[in-house]
Structures are given as structure tokens and as C-alpha cells.
Design a protein with these regions (language model features):
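Active-site-adjacent capping/gating segments
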Residues: 117, 124, 215-221
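Acidic-histidine catalytic/liganding microenvironments
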Residues: 6, 154, 219
Length: 221
């Protein structure tokens, strides 16, 4: 009916789980789709609860997919002179943004390993995460443990940096990861955020302060 009324229409619909399958009648809601998709096991601790994203990441991803579908539909309509219907689902969107994790699991059988420390990601090398300081928090991304150990003057961390187990030894690697986080936290806790970030920056460590919304709004960036 719509294309009869407007033969140039580009129509996009968004569902929860697609238009087929046993999940079809289920409510399509961000938290529920996060939980269904496996994403909630990508962070947190081994003995802790699954960890959903606090922002509506599934809704956001699906809205971007819908926007891209509209743009692709306009191109197809203009080239072929036909109306276009595109279908987007919340589930497809959250699977797309997990493509790295899911394909790794499917090709190797391995999953992200949550540990005793609250990892920011179950897939990343330590000390990928957030740590407390005397006056706030510091986030550390992919970085050299040896460089961090030198800046923090930590012999414990320097020793851990040279004793990383073989990647194929999951049990030993997990034990090593669990050992790294508390040592980094112990070294950072008595230090101030600003000067520590500056020192880590100078050593090539990817890091930054963890800010509140008020901090963000006041920042000159």
C-alpha cells in the first residue's frame, strides 16, 4: 500500500529479533537483547553478575544501522528506480558490534575470560581497565606493562611484565592476568590523577582520567 501511494519510498523497519524464529514474539528491549546476545559476559569478574552496558548500546547500534539502511536504500532507489524496504533488528545490531568477539569464539572455541579483578574487557591484556587514585580514577588501555612498571617504580609489576605465560596456556594466563590488576591498583592508589596521567603519557602509555559529566562539560575540548 505504501509503495503504491509513493513509488519512490524508502521504508525501514526495526524489530527486536528479526521477522522469523522462536524469539519473534519476545519484547525487543535493549537490556533483554544485550542479555540474549552474550555481550553481558564480556566484562566483570568470574564470580560476579553478568555486566550489561549502562547506556542503551543496542538501541544506538540499531539506529545507526537504520540510518545506513536508509542511505543505501536511497542510492538503490535512485539507480534502479524502485521503492526499497530494509529490515533492521536489535539483535543483528548487537551481533554486528561484537563481530570481533563472536568470530574469535567461533574460529578458536575460546571465550573472553573474566577474572578475580573487575576487567573492563574479558578479552584484553592487562592492565586494560580503570583504577583508583588519591583523587579520582585513571583508565589504562593497551599499554606496555614494562613502561607502566617503570613510571610507577614497581618491581612487582616489572617482574610480571617479564613473566607472561604462553598464550596457549589458558589457566596460567588467567592466573597471570589476575595477578597484574591488584599490583597496578596498589601502585596507583597513593598517586594523584593529573600528574600520574602526565607521567604515563610521557612514557607512551595509553591512559586518561575518568571524568564525570560535569568534568566533561567543563573540559575545553
Amino acid at each position: 500500500a505504501l509503495k503504491a501511494a509513493n513509488p519512490k519510498i524508502v521504508y525501514v523497519s526495526i524489530s527486536g529479533y528479526g521477522d522469523t524464529g522462536p524469539m519473534l514474539p519476545r519484547p525487543g528491549q535493549d537490556l533483554l537483547v544485550q542479555s540474549f546476545s552474550g555481550t553481558t559476559f564480556n566484562a566483570g569478574t568470574t564470580d560476579g553478575m553478568p555486566h550489561p552496558s549502562p547506556i542503551y548500546i543496542v538501541d544506538v547500534a540499531a539506529s545507526h544501522n537504520a540510518c545506513e539502511a536508509v542511505l543505501a536504500g536511497i542510492i538503490q532507489r535512485d539507480r534502479r528506480g524502485v521503492p526499497v524496504e530494509a529490515k533492521v533488528s536489535l539483535l543483528a545490531a548487537v551481533l554486528e558490534i561484537q563481530i570481533q568477539e563472536i568470530t574469535t569464539h567461533m574460529s578458536t572455541g575460546r571465550t573472553g575470560q573474566r577474572g578475580s579483578a573487575p576487567y573492563a574487557s574479558a578479552w584484553m591484556e592487562p592492565p586494560y581497565g580503570i583504577f583508583s587514585t588519591t583523587d579520582g580514577y585513571i583508565a589504562i588501555a593497551q599499554s606496555s606493562l614494562a613502561a607502566i612498571a617503570e613510571v610507577l617504580n614497581s618491581d612487582k609489576l616489572a617482574e610480571l611484565a617479564t613473566s607472561r605465560p604462553d598464550p596457549g596456556d589458558d589457566a596460567a594466563l588467567q592466573k597471570w592476568r589476575d595477578a597484574v590488576y591488584p599490583v597496578v591498583q596498589e601502585a596507583l592508589r597513593p598517586l594523584p590523577t593529573e600528574s600520574t596521567v602526565a607521567a604515563l603519557d610521557a612514557a607512551g602509555v595509553w591512559c586518561g582520567p575518568v571524568m564525570t559529566y560535569d568534568d566533561l562539560i567543563a573540559h575545553p575540548q
